A protein has these predicted regions:
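Conserved N-terminal catalytic core of the sugar/cofactor nucleotidyltransferase
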Residues: 1-82
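Catalytic cores of nucleotide-enabled group-transfer and carboxylate-activating enzymes in metabolic
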Residues: 11, 52-53, 60-62, 76-77, ...
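Structural beta-sheet core signal
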Residues: 14-15, 63-64, 89-92, 178
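Conserved core of the sugar-phosphate nucleotidyltransferase
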Residues: 21, 25, 31, 72-156, ...
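Residue-level signal for inorganic ion chemistry
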Residues: 51, 68, 80, 105, ...
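Conserved alpha/beta core of the MobA/IspD/sugar-nucleotide pyrophosphorylase nucleotidyltransferase superfamily
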Residues: 130-233
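Acidic, glycine-rich loop-and-beta core segments that form the ion-binding/anion-interacting portion
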Residues: 223-304
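Glycine-rich hexapeptide-repeat left-handed beta-helix
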Residues: 272-420
Length: 420
């Protein structure tokens, strides 16, 4: 909902009631939002009454949206505001095959909206009307002071209704017009977790269809979750069960394996991501192959043509061009040069319990399997670190460095056996 009205006003007013503190905390730091408290909740008109003292009276129009109708599009909101330049009062309406329970839109012979009639008050002829009110509207700000002051709660629910403003507008000779949304899901409301789940599936399918229309290959468009913005280049392929959060950019020719989770990450062209990978706040250079079961944490940067294999974790580290980290390895707070091979089981020991330290590995270095690099430490260009080494001091360039206990064979030793 807030995404739909982004840019329409410098400051948006959010009316909160139930769990108000939690809602405000969720949007903490948003300088474009202000909050009005509605306690108790006494109808839609009452909600606007609470917002009225903090609304900008200099704005010619006031767009009223509903928090439980989350999928209003920016295009529909824009068309409503454009229509408001011709008609002061604009309703968002929709035609339904079965409008039972909804307020009907009554028009005169010229097609001008004259009233909203609730079903219980409608005549038999009015009940045949299929155009109904969604509750979303654009109102003339200059008239709101008088209209809100005139609202009454003399109904069975003792609530103040925004729909009563239509009658005030008609009495004042204000022209009322209506705009239809492009899609019915834009005005679907949510009153239960069942409805929320159903609408979420609708929205995910809408996003999946947009990707398909743009040329993205989705192995199963019903099994993808986009929880933010996903930007795809040409010839992208996404397997089943993938989740994209925040802003994710996939370059041309990227393939994403099944059940991968990618958050706030940029992936350049021709990258293959094998199944069950997890990326967050990372940057992946072109022609790389990652996974399966790889994790890129915030600050991980792969510069290109990198291999990051199974059960490898990279955090706050730069991996140079053509370097490989293929198996069972942790690279944290490190600068790894170009054409480096990091053997299985290598760990950059970057944390002493209080502080984090960096590891620097020069170009063309070879790190043997099961090496511990005790940071801060540097490995020179072209250096070789023998398997099983615990490196506590800098390793010189172009030389073999290793530390391991001398191998021994104990003559005459026998393995203990259990007593019978």
């Amino acid at each position: 909902m807030l995404d739909a009205v982004e840019g329409f006003a410098a400051v948006k007013t959010v009316v909160v009631g139930h769990c108000a503190e939690e809602v405000q905390k969720h949007y903490e730091g948003r300088t474009d939002l202000q909050f009005a408290l509605q306690m108790p909740q006494q109808g839609t008109g009452h909600a606007l009454m609470q917002a009225w003292p903090v609304l900008d009276r200099n704005e010619p129009q006031t767009l009223v949206c509903l928090g439980d109708v989350p999928l209003l599009s920016a295009e529909t909101a824009r068309r409503m505001l454009e229509e408001a330049e011709k008609s002061e009062f604009v309703l968002l309406t929709i035609e339904m095959d079965n409008p039972k329970g909804y307020g009907r839109i009554v028009r005169n012979a010229e097609g001008v909206v004259t009233a909203i009639v609730e079903e219980k008050d409608a005549t038999d002829e009015q009940r045949l009307i299929r155009e109904v009110n969604t509750g979303i509207m654009v109102l003339p700000t200059a008239r709101l002071d008088a209209w809100l002051d005139a609202l009454k709660n003399d109904n069975a629910q003792k609530e103040y209704y925004l729909t009563d403003l239509v009658g005030f507008a008609a009495a004042d000779g204000v022209r009322i017009s209506a705009v239809h949304p492009d899609h019915a899901y834009e005005v679907e409301g949510v009153n239960s977790k069942v409805q929320l789940a159903a609408l979420e599936r609708t929205w995910q399918r809408v996003q999946a269809d947009r990707l398909l229309e743009a040329g993205v290959t989705l192995i199963d468009p019903d099994r993808i979750d986009i929880r933010g913005e996903l930007v795809c280049g040409q010839d992208v392929e996404i397997d089943v069960g993938c989740v994209f959060e925040g802003r994710v950019v996939l370059g041309n020719g990227v393939r994403v394996g099944a059940y991968s989770v990618i958050r706030n990450t940029t992936v350049e062209d021709d990258v293959e991501i094998l199944p069950f990978c997890h990326f967050e706040g990372a940057a992946v250079g072109r022609d790389s192959c990652i996974g399966p079961y790889s994790r890129l944490r915030p600050g991980a940067e792969l510069t290109g043509n990198n291999h990051i294999g199974n059960f490898v974790e990279v955090k706050k580290s730069v991996i140079g061009q053509d370097s490989k980290v293929n198996h069972l390895t942790y690279i944290g707070d490190a600068d790894v040069g170009a054409r480096v091979n990091v053997g299985a089981g290598t760990i950059t020991c970057n944390y002493d319990g209080v502080n984090k330290f960096r590891t620097v590995i020069g170009d063309d270095a070879f790190i043997g399997s099961d090496t511990q690099l005790i940071a801060p430490v540097e490995v020179g260009a072209g250096a070789t670190i023998g398997a099983g080494t615990t490196l506590t001091r800098n390793a010189p360039a172009g030389k073999l460095t290793l530390s391991r206990a001398r191998q021994m064979t104990i003559e005459g030793w026998t393995r203990p056996v259990k007593k019978q």
